[in-house]
From Swiss-Prot:
It comes from the Bacteria. The lineage of its organism: Bacteria, Pseudomonadati, Pseudomonadota, Alphaproteobacteria, Sphingomonadales. This is Heme A synthase. Belongs to the COX15/CtaA family. Type 2 subfamily. Heme binds at H272, H328. Pfam families: COX15-CtaA. It is a multi-pass membrane protein.
Length: 350
């Protein structure tokens, strides 16, 4: 049997956990801002990746004009926004959201890296946690690179970014969020003298199924498939049906099953909306298992996935209204955190 952690180790573990929860909250926030950036078509408004020099926005009229001139070379401007009459004033709006998204990413990097260095130098990181914290730092760096890789696809090849790259960008963010929450919860357990949790059983299944649902949600977003079912408030032909049918008529299988499963707007939307119920069924089981040992976690999980289902329906009925769709993405991130918490509780060694 391992020795009980010392009071100083317990205090250090709790301090680290609080720091990681702050970073996790910031990741949830950047996922929401990323949703705004996507829905306002702002992602390719900044055509260069300058990790340091790009921290400040343009100040002078000449700087703004230079940024606008660079954007005018993109397919998005030449084929969509240019013919629509985009002005410099309109460009400033989409620039703002992409700049905020990148600034928040830089801030998260600083908020993670600086305290990590301090805890490391002060030898306040408990045994066994250094590799995990370094891995989380590496995931953050990877996310920055994936973000630029995604944006580049909309600058060079198309009027919008690749839906595969968008899905990769979102999943790396949510995987990082799950890692932050799980590690923080392990540290909270250490501060109480308890063992680390194990990801297993129904908790592992729930997270795996949720990952697939989030992947298809990202494909729906990247393909602009949210409106493929139709729209209109309380229009049953748009939900639960799709354009009046249970199964959409427009699925194109001609280019092969793999292409249809990953790139057909009707089929991707269909899978996303119905796989959600399989995920809900598993989450109900998880919540019921938690009810006796942690009623609070059970209520939180029920509340979050219930809200997420309603927001998904409202997103369709509203024709993908900006703030409803952003809330859908925001609550999706909260669902990752809530499911991670639930899986951690189920995997606790007693």
């Amino acid at each position: 049997m391992s020795a009980s952690p010392s009071p100083s180790t317990r205090a250090d573990a709790l301090a680290l956990a609080r720091w990681l929860f702050v970073v996790a909250f910031m990741v949830v926030a950047i996922v929401a801002v990323g949703g705004i950036t996507r829905l306002t078509e702002s992602g390719v408004s900044i055509t260069e990746w300058k990790p340091v020099a790009g921290t400040l926005p343009p100040i002078t009229d000449a700087q703004w004009q230079a940024e606008f001139d660079a954007y005018r070379q993109t397919p998005q401007f030449q084929l969509v926004n240019g013919p629509a009459g985009m002005t410099l004033a309109t460009y400033k709006f989409i620039f703002f959201w992409e700049w905020v998204h990148r600034l928040l990413a830089r801030t998260i990097g600083l908020v993670f890296a600086a305290p990590l260095a301090w805890f490391w130098i002060k030898r306040r990181i408990p045994e066994g946690y250094k590799p995990r914290l370094v891995a989380l730092l590496a995931l953050g760096a990877l996310q920055g690179a994936v973000g630029w890789w995604m944006v580049k696809s909309g600058i060079v090849n198309d009027v919008k970014v690749s839906h595969f790259r968008l899905a990769t960008h979102l999943l790396v963010a949510l995987f990082t969020l799950g890692g932050l929450v799980w590690t923080a919860l392990d540290l909270v357990a250490l501060s109480k003298g308890e063992a680390r949790s194990r990801l297993r059983g129904i908790g592992l299944l729930a997270l795996a199924m949720l990952v697939l649902q989030l992947f298809y949600g990202a494909l729906v977003a990247g393909l602009r498939a949210g409106t493929s079912a139709g729209g209109g408030w309380f229009n049953w032909d748009a939900w639960p049906l799709m354009q009046g049918s249970l199964y959409p008529d427009g699925v194109d299988w001609a280019t092969g099953a793999v292409h249809a499963l990953l790139s057909d707007v009707f089929l991707v939307h269909f899978i996303h909306r119905w796989w959600a119920w399989a995920v809900v069924a598993v989450l109900v089981v998880v919540a019921r298992k938690l009810r006796k040992t942690n009623r609070k976690a059970s209520i939180v999980l029920h509340s979050v996935f219930g809200t997420q289902v309603l927001l998904g329906i409202f997103t369709v009925w509203s024709g993908v209204a900006l703030w409803i769709a952003v809330l859908h993405q925001f609550v999706g991130a909260l669902l990752v955190a809530a499911t991670t918490w639930s899986a951690h509780l189920l995997g606790a060694r007693r």
